[in-house]
């Protein structure tokens, strides 16, 4: 869970739909790297730039998240371990494959229930609770005893870290975010993220409030092969057989269909319930821990290095 404050910036390589950024094996460490060049595209052309985590999350800049992983040391396996603790795994139940594309950008097979459960860990301030498909069983008019629903819940992520991630994930639903049109009714606090696979054959929106986490997947089955690409979509209300009165879309993204469906589900489910705010993260998460830098002026090289080491720094001589 080590990382950068939410106010930090990361370096994002220039990238776009037709000019992907290239990453090589030398940029990653550990066993979850790449064996050949990995090409990463953003949905729109962007230059080499330093971009804040707030902007990168709100605008869904793929190369910024790769840049963040590299700034964290380039060991994607550590990121995968955190995902596993949060309840994120493949549809088979196994860990996410050991490749940066799967770990950092989500290019793998997972179920909506799994992703909603992982986001629930954030909504619950770092405490993971496994999904419970059966809430009660009634036999002959009597409810049978079931294990306490909260008995399997356990802390998987530091509460302050979870609050910091939630702070970032509120960006996509705000003005300028990828899903700014899907904010919840009445300004109810919510956090979430859009997701779009190559070719738009799968699009997602996963989001949550302090009470509820919901994942929406819009896609087509694997066995349709080339027909999986979701384009030129015509939407119409139930009962209508002609026309596209609910919208026509040439290209589909996570914000196009999945996010509005998510909003409709959340608004209806939470209607009439109190609007609960998210807890704010502390300054150590938003701004980083402040430490005093020792005065090493007029010190010998050895003395200066010793003072910096004593203060917790790792000195480097250039």
Range-by-range predicted roles:
Residues 272-318:
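Ligand-recognition elements built from short beta-strands and adjacent flexible loops
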Residues 49-53, 61-68, 75-84, 101, ...:
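Stable alpha-helical elements in mature extracytoplasmic
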Residues 1, 6, 10-11, 19, ...:
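Extended, hydrophobic alpha-helical segments in both membrane/secreted and soluble proteins
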Residues 39-44, 52-54, 63-71, 100-108, ...:
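Second-shell loop/turn segments in exported
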Residues 31-39, 73-117:
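Mid-domain, small-residue-enriched loop/turn segments at the edges of structured enzyme/sensor domains
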Residues 4-7, 33, 55-58, 109-286:
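A penicillin-recognizing enzyme superfamily signal
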Residues 1-50, 129-144:
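Short, glycine/proline-biased beta-turn/loop segments that scaffold the active-site neighborhood
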Residues 2-3, 13, 59, 63, ...:
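Structured segments of extracytoplasmic/periplasmic soluble domains
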